[in-house]
Amino acid sequence: DGGLTEEFADKTLKIGEKLSFRRFEKVEGDCVASYIHGGGRIGVLVAAEGASDDAAKEALTNVAMQIAAMNPQYIAKEDISAEELAKTKEITIDSALNDPASLPKPILNSLFAKAVEGSVFSAEDAAAYEEQKNNKYLFNFLSEAAKKSLAELALADKAAIVENKIFNGLVEGRISKQLKEITLLEQPYVKAEDGKQTVKAYLASVNKDLKLTKMVRFEVGEGM
């Protein structure tokens, strides 16, 4: 693009340093908005279809500010590939198994029974368990070695545990929370008065036909 080349050359002359044009994105739509944050440290472009009036432009500018602040990875859940979802689930499962204290009580009780019956615990940990097993702060009385042993037992019994409905509910709840954090439309809108309105609901309140089609977020030093 000749205009872009000339603009780039002009900026190079003004700054007095050699610049390299490392990346760019072309964004098109019925409505496009941009936002620059931190003196140029973060730049955002966002595009939408379905509306192009002033209200839509203001809404997209607000959403661009949201993207700069919250750094979502996707616009909607539907944009996340099946492979990425499967990877997220596997990581979440392993994370839960490596944190026995967070496991549902029936599963945890089973792990404790195996640890005691298999003499996995040291004498001190076995005694602490017997004395404090009804204490909700039981894990405060166990050594790190005992906690590690429980995690190893959980991982060894992974195939059976993942079939447990309670465990699956725990995993799905954690995944849902993660997806809300990385998906723009599911994030709480940062300017919402009640702190609960999602970006999706905010856009619908402005214009039900306004649909985001693309977002771009660049940050200085990113990807280098």
State each model region's role.
Residues 1-224:
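N-terminal assembly/interaction segments in proteins that build large macromolecular machines
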